[in-house]
Structure formats: C-alpha cells, structure tokens
C-alpha cells in the first residue's frame, strides 16, 4: 500500500514538472477566451448644406432683373411714389437702375410734391452697377434703413455681389443722397440764407433740391449701414459721395454708418442740422468728412482710416463755398475721433478749416503725413472774434487734441503757423507733437490713455461724456465690431465680414 501511494505521488510530481508556467491556470480559471475587438463605428458623414434656393420672383414695387451670382436681382427704378418696404429674403438682392428717387420734392415749405417712405429691413443688400445708379431721398420723404449689429444693411456695387471687388476698388456706383428742409447758407436764388425758400441743388445731380427753415426736419433713419465702393464725378467739383446729406434736419437719426472706398468724400454735409454718431470711414479717396454751407451739428465717435500713400486727401475739410460771410455760419462740433492719414499724393493737410467756418474739436487723435492743421480764411474770416449778431462763434476751439505729423501747423500768409499754434495752444490738454501708441491702427494705447479728456457733454446734450480721447478707449471697447467690414489695411475683428464679400 505504501509502495502504491509513493508511485502515485511520483506521477503527480512528474506531471507538474512537465507543465510550463503558461499552462498553469489561476484559481477559478476555466478556458481562456480572447474577446473579439469592438468594431470601430462607421463615422456619420457630414451632411452637405442645402443651398439657399433662389426666389423665383420679386416683391411688389420691384421688377425681376434675372439672376446674378446665384441671387435673384430685384430692380428699383424711376420714382418711388408710395411707401415701399424692401424685405430681407434669402437668395435675393435689390439693385438701383439709374437715379432712383424716393418721393417728389415737397419744397422748403413742404406744401408741394408728394412724399414717400422707403423702409429697408436688416440684412438687405442693394447694389448699383455704374456711377449713374444712385438713390435720392427727396425733401419731405424718408428713408428708414435700420440694420442691426449682426445684420447690417449693405449698399454696394455689382462687382461686390459678383465677388470681383478688391481692396482697391472704388467709384463703382453713385451713392446715397439724403435731402431735407433744414436751413442752409448758400441759396441758388437771391434769397436770405436760412429762409424757407433758400434752396440749392445737391452735388452729383442737376435738380435734386435741399434747404428750408425747418431745423428739426426728419429725413428718416440710417443705422447699422455700410455704403461700399461708391462715389462718382459728374464733373470737376460736382461729385457724388458715399453719403451726401443736404439740408438734413436734427430729427434725422444717423449712427453706426460705415463708408468704404468712396472715390470722393466719405460723408459730405451741405448745411442743415444733422447729428451723427459712431462713424467708420475707410479708404475715402478725397476727404473723410466734408462740411459746408452753414452746417450746424454734433458728431461723436469717428474712426477714419485712409487706404495707403496713393489715395485720399484731408481727413476733414470744412468751408462755405467761397461765400465766407453768408449766414447761417457753419458751426461743427466734433468729439472722440481717431484720424489715420496715409496719403502723400493729394493736398497737404490732415485737417483743413477754411471759408469762415466755426469749428470745435475735443478728445481727438490726429496722425498725418504732412501738415496736421491748416486754418485758411480771406481777411482772417476763420479766426475772427465771436460776434453773435453775425452768427460768428469765434476762432476754432481745441481741447484734449493730440497730433503727430511732420509739421504740426501749416505756414501760409493768410494764417501763419504761429497764429494757428496760438489758437491750438489756447485750449486745454493739447499736444501737437505726441508719440502714438495706438494698437490695431485705431485702439488707444498708453500714451493716448494718459491724456485728460474734455467733458464733451458741456457742448451739447447730444454728446456723451467720456474719460478718454479718441474713438476707441481700449481693446474692450468694441462699438465698431460686427456691423462693419474689414479690408487689408484695417480690421475691425473676426465678427466683421470682409468688405470684398457679402
């Protein structure tokens, strides 16, 4: 029995020795089964976006102009004699065929003609194909073009719709002309300036009249609007601007407006009483802001940037068409502006004040290529003392203005540089030789932030009080973003589209 037990134990030991370590299962193990790997899921294909269908017809009040670059083209032409609404319809754009009038001129007294209202919804695009295509809103009629911060209204050129416009394109269609019954100084008849029958023909047309005696006249609202690639010369000295305001009254609302690559001025104001706020003027080939014919008003928050050394003239031109003692006298008040002049081919001034104009500038930044400030005037008309009996406010006024140009003040016989310097230095916190520290072309840096601001609200209730100079306080101040368009020479951020695209 002991012998048999020993034999069995020896067999068991030999069996264990014959087994490799890999053949020994852990306690409780059975058959080892290697699981089949989970198959990689087939990715869901990204759906192809459904193209916006092109509308098959056009709204009432327009005619079908066919298809242009995948858009239905709905044409405005002739005279709009009754109220018209241009709706935002996906896949549809509107166009101007020739001069398009809103209403018929009602005259300075508002007793003639026929008024009409053109309303444009946010996101609408309206284009012109040539310099003969432009929009005129006549006295007594109104334009309500109210876009939004994320969906601006765009007035532009056919080439922009077709995708062929570039950052050097300009003068590809006429522009927008807004007329009213507010006072002007220069009449086309032997009439006293500012009278109800004092009227004139606006530049770029032969018979579009403006002027009257209604200071608070209301020509409508332009808000969150772009006007691209406009401007057209009918004849030398007779041009359409990006936006032309003739005799427009203070009841008109004008804010958040960009003028891009106008072949003439960005905005020209012929008399009247309009107030403007939040303006962006990019690439104007003449003056950025031109004011004439007894304009009285307030303008705040302006960014104006020229394209390059070969395009543009002054950032401001203010005068009165040679009639320097005509009344009402121009009295423009400008606050919180940043001007970037780059042109070296036209004019010699960044700011030109002449023709007996009265002008007040506060909280401004001026960067130029030649003379920062030129004040002209026959017989000292632009620098004469205040005289309420003659509607004269006195010499130009400057507070919290900083300038950086090769020459601060232009030296000429009518107003020598020393006299201009005395006027400039009579204000507070001015610096004619400051060093710019702007970022992204127009945003204040350390040197700009160090300047003590002037309380602009003391000049009029339209002005907001700010604690900074310039148009843009810092990188967190983004009033310009989203509703503007970008170019290679200036960017307003990723929320703004490129000007060359819709």
Q: Where are these predicted regions, by residue range?
A:
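Ser/Thr-rich, Proline-interspersed low-complexity disordered segments
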Residues: 34-56
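Glycine-rich loop(s) and the adjacent beta-strand/alpha-helix scaffold that form part
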Residues: 151-152
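Bacterial N-terminal signal peptides that target proteins for export
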Residues: 1-8
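Extracellular beta-rich repeat passengers
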Residues: 26-32, 51-117, 129-140, 147, ...
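C-terminal motif of bacterial Sec signal peptides marking the signal peptidase cleavage site
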Residues: 15-18
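Bacterial signal peptide processing site
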Residues: 20-23
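Hydrophobic helical h-region of N-terminal Sec-dependent signal peptides
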Residues: 9-13
């Amino acid at each position: 029995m002991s012998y048999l037990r020993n034999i069995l134990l020896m067999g068991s030991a030999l069996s264990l020795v014959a087994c490799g370590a890999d053949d020994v299962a852990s306690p409780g193990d059975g058959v080892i089964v290697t699981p089949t790997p989970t198959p990689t899921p087939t990715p869901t294909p990204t759906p192809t976006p459904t193209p916006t269908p092109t509308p098959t017809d056009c709204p009432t009040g327009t005619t079908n102009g066919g298809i242009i670059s995948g858009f239905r083209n709905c044409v405005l032409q002739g005279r709009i004699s009754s109220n018209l609404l241009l709706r935002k319809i996906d896949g549809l754009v509107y166009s101007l065929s020739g001069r398009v009038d809103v209403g018929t001129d009602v005259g300075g007294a508002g007793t003639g003609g026929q008024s009409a209202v053109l309303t444009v919804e946010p996101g609408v695009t309206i284009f012109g194909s040539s310099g003969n295509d432009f929009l005129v809103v006549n006295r007594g009629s109104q334009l309500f073009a109210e876009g939004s911060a994320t969906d601006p209204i765009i007035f532009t050129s056919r080439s922009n719709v077709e995708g062929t416009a570039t950052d050097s394109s300009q003068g590809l269609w006429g522009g927008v002309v807004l007329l009213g019954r507010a006072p002007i100084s220069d009449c086309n008849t032997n009439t006293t300036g500012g009278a109800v029958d004092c009227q004139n023909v606006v530049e770029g047309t032969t018979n579009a009249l403006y002027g009257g005696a209604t200071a608070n006249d209301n020509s409508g609202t332009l808000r969150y609007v772009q006007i691209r690639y406009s401007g057209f010369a009918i004849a030398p000295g007779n041009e359409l601007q990006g936006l032309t305001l003739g005799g427009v009254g203070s009841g008109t609302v004008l804010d958040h407006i960009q003028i891009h690559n106008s072949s003439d001025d960005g905005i020209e104001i012929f008399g009247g009483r309009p107030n403007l706020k939040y303006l962006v003027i990019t690439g104007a080939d003449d003056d950025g802001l031109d004011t004439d014919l007894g304009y009285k008003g307030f303008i705040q928050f302006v960014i104006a940037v020229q394209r390059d050394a070969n395009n543009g003239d002054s950032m401001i031109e203010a005068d009165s068409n040679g009639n320097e003692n005509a009344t009402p006298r121009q009295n423009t008040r400008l606050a919180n502006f940043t001007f970037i002049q780059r042109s070296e081919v036209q004019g010699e001034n960044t700011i030109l004040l002449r023709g007996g104009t009265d002008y007040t500038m506060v909280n401004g930044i001026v960067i130029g290529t030649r003379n920062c400030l030129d004040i002209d005037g026959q017989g000292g008309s632009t620098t004469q003392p205040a005289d309420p009996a003659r509607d004269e406010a006195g010499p130009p006024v400057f507070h919290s203005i900083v300038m950086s140009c090769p020459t601060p003040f232009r030296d000429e016989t009518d107003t020598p540089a020393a006299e201009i310097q005395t006027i400039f230095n009579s204000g507070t916190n001015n610096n004619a030789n400051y060093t710019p520290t702007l970022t992204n072309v127009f945003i204040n840096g350390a040197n700009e932030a160090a300047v003590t601001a002037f309380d602009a609200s003391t000049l009029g209730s339209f002005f907001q009080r700010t604690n900074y100079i310039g148009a843009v306080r810092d990188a967190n101040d983004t009033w310009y973003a989203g509703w503007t368009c970008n170019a290679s020479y200036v960017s307003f951020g990723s929320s703004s589209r490129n000007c060359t695209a819709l």
